[in-house]
Amino acid sequence: MKKNRLFSAALSVLLFIGIGAPKAQAQDYYQAPPLNPEFEVLANQVVTLNLDDPEGANKAFAKLLKKIVGKKNDLFAVGDYFLKNNAYSAASQCAKKITDEMAGEDVNVYMFKGEVYMKGKQWGRAGEEYEKALYYDSTYVPAIRRNAFVYKNINPDAALDYLDKLQRIEPENFRVNKDKGDIYYKLKRRDAAIENYQAYYKSAPKDSTVLDFNSCQQYVLSLFEAQEAAKVGELSTEMLQLWPNAMVFKRMRFLADVDTYDLDAAAEHVSYIVNQEYPDSSYKYLDYFYAAKLNELNNELEPAIEYYKKALAVDSTQALAYKDLSNIYSQNQQAELGLETYKKYLEVIGDKADLSDRFFLGRRYVAVYQEPGVDPEKKQQCFDEANKIFAEVMEKKPDFIEVYIQCARLNNTDSSVANDTVKNYYLKVIEMTAETPDEYKRQRLEASKYLFFYAINVEPNDMQLARRVLDIAAGINPNDKFVQQATK
């Protein structure tokens, strides 16, 4: 007796997993046969008794099962009743009693069994049942749809094949493009995702009850990743007509404004950040990063600094924000903060740092060295460190013109005295740019001016050098004030 009660209790648990949950929505994937009124009474009794009398429910189920076993249509109809009332295990037992021999060529039975397995999240077994339906009717749309759904997470290529098949049968079904776009998006196949989302958005009614919000969001995000800023702005504006409070579309519209340098529109659309329209936790790194960019483009350095700091507070792994913040600090006469922030940038990128990163670190040291009020000892340290870094860059990339310019400027510590070290750096610039003078006019003009100064101030004067570099400067810009004064 005790054993039987334990079995009954276990059976009760199996039979009624899911009872008490909201009723499943009826689907159009299959058509069940009519339910015999006698069996409907028993099935309803099984469902209602379970809450107060599990043992009675089990007896009712056993009685019902005994009456319908071996009868395909009755097993199907009763199983459908249990499935629609979320009695998954009871529905499953009915489905299992219907053998393939009993089902024969009845695609509705295979679809029902597939839905039972779907309810139990047995995706592979569900797919097998849908395949059986397709074996008997290769164009059976419900089976194609469900297989596409089943496979989209476990075998996306198979899902795409089913969707292609469905598209050939239903070429006007815009949801097929939506589903294909979703799969390609998940696979990170951006161009294919955009192509399908574009077809979906073009064909679907512009109605928020029809269009899928997540797919529209992924469409815009894919375009943003593809750097289609103008299209991002256009679509985000349209989608805000459908979902006026959707933060993602306000964000993407604002980002597009900044990327297209539409600063007036950006100043208007940044309001969702400025006015704190959403909870703090809703704002992402890109919100603050682009707000910083907008202020930077408007030469509003202090607000830009604050937004960069907010961006990094959200995501401290974003190297670009450290680099850009370092630049802003330097522009804002905060060179020491610029140097420390640039070091943080190098720390974040780690082994990805290249020679250009080292070069710009040298420039940050130069900025601190040149900033008024810096402690003399620190000033000297920055001078030495900058020269050391520039020497390293020269050694590894001897054809990098700009590093010679920077070294010349750094070592020109007294502009009233002719300096051999500075002269040699500028001579190197003239020499290295001789074959491509038009590409380096600015650098050659700067070098020529210093070399002329050096030539007429060194003892004895080097008039040959003076004439040579004056000719170079005159060839670059005969109206330059230096050229006009030197030729008098």
Spans of features found by a protein language model:
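Alpha-solenoid helical repeat scaffolds
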Residues: 27-459, 488
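Alpha-solenoid helical-repeat scaffold
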Residues: 458, 462-467, 479-482
